[in-house]
């Protein structure tokens, strides 16, 4: 769970500290055939890099191979990018709320793919996904009040 929280939280904290510096959107502003951007301007290379760095450090602190932390972060960010892609295709605004779609892909994908490496059971994976959903639901409004998140979700 700490790997997930570190990978997911790193881009948010990095944005808080760096503001608008080094912001390079992953989709480079490209649009899909529906006229909407592929992912949106909030999905940046800076965010992916910060997730990888923080999750690999967290893995090291947890006694897990840093390479597992790198893969965990990359899979977490891939899940987040897939969710953003789906939200754009559904016509949802950038950074809009979409319960489940906002949390399930980025928690399920790394846990599922790294199940063996992290010695997770299917029950563990289900609990990780559920717990991450609940943390996002209840902690995000607090982080918004503290001006760490830009939205209360």
Label each PLM-derived region with a short phrase.
Residues 1-66, 70, 77-112, 122-153:
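Interhelical loop and helix-boundary elements at the membrane-water interface
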């Amino acid at each position: 769970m700490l790997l997930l929280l570190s990978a997911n939280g790193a881009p948010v904290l990095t944005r808080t500290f760096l503001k608008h510096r080094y912001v390079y959107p992953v989709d480079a502003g490209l649009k899909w055939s529906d006229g909407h951007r592929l992912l949106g301007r909030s999905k940046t290379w800076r965010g992916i890099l910060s997730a990888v760095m923080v999750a690999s450090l967290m893995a090291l602190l947890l006694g897990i191979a840093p390479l597992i932390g790198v893969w965990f972060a990359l899979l977490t960010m891939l899940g987040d990018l897939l969710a953003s892609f789906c939200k754009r295709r559904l016509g949802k605004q950038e950074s809009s709320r979409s319960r489940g779609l906002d949390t399930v892909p980025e928690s399920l994908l790394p846990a599922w793919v790294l199940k063996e490496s992290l010695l997770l059971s299917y029950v563990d994976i289900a609990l990780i996904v559920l717990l991450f959903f609940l943390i996002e639901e209840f902690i995000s409004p607090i982080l918004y009040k503290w001006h760490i998140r830009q939205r209360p979700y």
